[in-house]
């Protein structure tokens, strides 16, 4: 059963969606991004939500990076573990997404921001994946820190790729998430 707060959020979201659906559908139709894929890692679900919205607006397929050993669910133990991994330069083993990179020219890559940087599972995938010649459209989700060093991390880890400007989303996005995404697609689309 939904709590009163969850119910109200759903009603407000539905009202907003119905009110803006036709104009968003028109704008989204401008972005059928051929040869584009979305690759992301999500710990809490925020980055997954944004990746799903981008996919809905672009019709791009979605591929998830999954760590072989999941991070703790609780915030503090996760931040402690991530900090230790970063200090040691440790990249966790992952279950890489089954994506044929030859099928795509543009990769929309999503990550939560962890200690000002891209998440370690994303860093693992980037370190073992040749993205030469690809266009990287990064996006990050955060809990208050904003973009931080995430775009710089993509530039550093993808030196033979073109990295566009980033989409930065607080949490899993506000009620205007679709508008934020469409604005970003217009500004960053190669």
Which ranges hold each PLM region?
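N-terminal secretory signal peptides and thylakoid transit peptides that target proteins
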Residues: 1-15
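Boundary at the C-terminal end of the N-terminal hydrophobic targeting segment
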Residues: 25-27
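Short Asp/Glu-rich motifs
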Residues: 72-74
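FMN-binding flavodoxin-like domain, especially the glycine-rich phosphate-binding loop
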Residues: 2, 29-70, 80-190
């Amino acid at each position: 059963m939904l709590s009163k707060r969850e119910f109200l959020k759903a009603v407000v979201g539905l009202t907003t969606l119905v009110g803006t659906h036709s104009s968003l559908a028109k704008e989204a139709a401008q972005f059928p991004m051929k040869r584009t894929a979305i690759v992301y890692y999500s710990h809490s679900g925020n980055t997954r939500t944004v990746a799903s919205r981008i996919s809905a607006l672009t019709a791009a397929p979605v591929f998830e990076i999954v760590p072989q050993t999941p991070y703790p669910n609780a915030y503090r133990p996760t931040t402690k573990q991530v900090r230790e991994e970063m200090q040691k330069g440790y990249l966790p083993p992952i279950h890489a997404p089954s994506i044929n990179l030859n099928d795509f020219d543009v990769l929309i890559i999503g990550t939560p921001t962890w200690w000002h940087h891209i998440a370690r599972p994303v860093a693992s995938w980037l370190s073992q994946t040749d993205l030469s010649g690809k266009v990287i459209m990064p996006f990050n989700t955060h809990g208050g820190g904003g973009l931080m060093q995430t775009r710089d991390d993509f530039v550093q880890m993808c030196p033979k790729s073109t990295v566009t400007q980033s989409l930065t989303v607080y949490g899993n996005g506000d009620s205007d998430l679709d508008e934020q995404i469409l604005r970003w697609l217009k500004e960053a689309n190669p």
